[in-house]
Curated annotation (Swiss-Prot):
It is found in: Cytoplasm. InterPro entries: PABS (IPR030374), PABS_CS (IPR030373), SAM-dependent_MTases_sf (IPR029063), Spermi_synthase (IPR001045), Spermidine_synt_N (IPR035246), Spermidine_synt_N_sf (IPR037163). Gene3D superfamilies: Spermidine synthase, tetramerisation domain, Vaccinia Virus protein VP39. Homodimer or homotetramer. Belongs to the spermidine/spermine synthase family. It catalyses: S-adenosyl 3-(methylsulfanyl)propylamine + putrescine = S-methyl-5'-thioadenosine + spermidine + H(+). Its main location: cytoplasm. Pfam families: Spermine_synt_N, Spermine_synth. Pathway: Amine and polyamine biosynthesis; spermidine biosynthesis; spermidine from putrescine: step 1/1. GO terms for biological process: spermidine biosynthetic process. This is Polyamine aminopropyltransferase.
Amino acid sequence: MDLWLREGQIEDAAMTYKIKETLVTKKTKYQELAIVDTYALGRMLVLDGIVQTTVKDEYVYHEMITHIPLFTHPNPQKVLIVGGGDGGTVREVLKHETVEKVVLCEIDEQVVYECKKYLPEISCELDNPKCEVFIGDGIKYVHQHRNEFDVIIVDSTDPFGAAEGLFGGSFYKEIYNCLTEDGIFIAQTETPFYLPEVVKQVYKDAKEIFPITRLFMAGIPTYPSGFWSFTIGSKKYDPKEVDLSSTLNINTKYYTKELHKACFVLPKFVEDLTR
């Protein structure tokens, strides 16, 4: 008998994945957690029934949410990641030699624990001496730190439940204060196909706070519609105008210097959401 995972992506649409093996399922303090091995996409982290990352395509998301801001900032030394307990963003951040410290603030310690156990390709840098794993509320952490981080990456789940407070103007104001005087913030901001109102509102909220606000897209097969948005807010540096003439000094599978520029070219219906 075949076993399938059905992910309800929106009210009227779903994706299904054929499961080879269920590695772990548990109810944590905050959510239902599962890691399964699938035939099509390899091992997969699922939270509250929603696919968060897979071994097959995780590099797209983690490279784009990391390298766009870190190559935009001329000297990123201290980085904060809110969420991202799987460790993929930490892995990509630590490819940058300028980074002296990265703080991962994850509310659910079980995500970190199980990903270290079952997703070593993604979580491989969580024990790096440059990485501090802080288990706690990202909103409170940001509020308690001022003028400290060069880059803040909000690597959150969808804007529901525990992650709902990570979307919106009040949190972005706290992020602004947590950043250094030339700091950069980035967040994953859902799909413009299914959730255009979320994309539009997040961009509007960020633009009211940051002098430079940009939206860019990436193709991520696992995520609803496969067409995903990221919003970046910067105090000083424009990611569209950054000088990338020097040789790329890190190994990537998706991000390139050319793509850094190209990803900001938006389809008209997405561009309209930024107006």
